[in-house]
């Protein structure tokens, strides 16, 4: 439910951070 959604959003934020740092 909401906990899974929070974990997914956290994962997306981590990915976005990595992608942003790469550029």
UniProtKB/Swiss-Prot annotation:
Keywords: Amphibian defense peptide, Antibiotic, Antimicrobial, Fungicide, Immunity, Innate immunity, Secreted
Primary location: secreted
InterPro entries per UniProt: Antimicrobial_19 (IPR013156)
A Pfam match: Antimicrobial19
Tissue-by-tissue expression: Expressed by the skin glands.
Annotated GO biological process: defense response to bacterium; defense response to fungus; innate immune response; killing of cells of another organism; xenobiotic metabolic process
Localization of this protein: Secreted
GO cellular component: extracellular region
Known function: Possesses antifungal activity against C.albicans and is also active against E.coli and S.aureus.
Annotated family: Belongs to the frog skin active peptide (FSAP) family. Pseudin subfamily.
Name assigned to this protein: Pseudin-3
High-level lineage: Eukaryota, Metazoa, Chordata, Craniata, Vertebrata
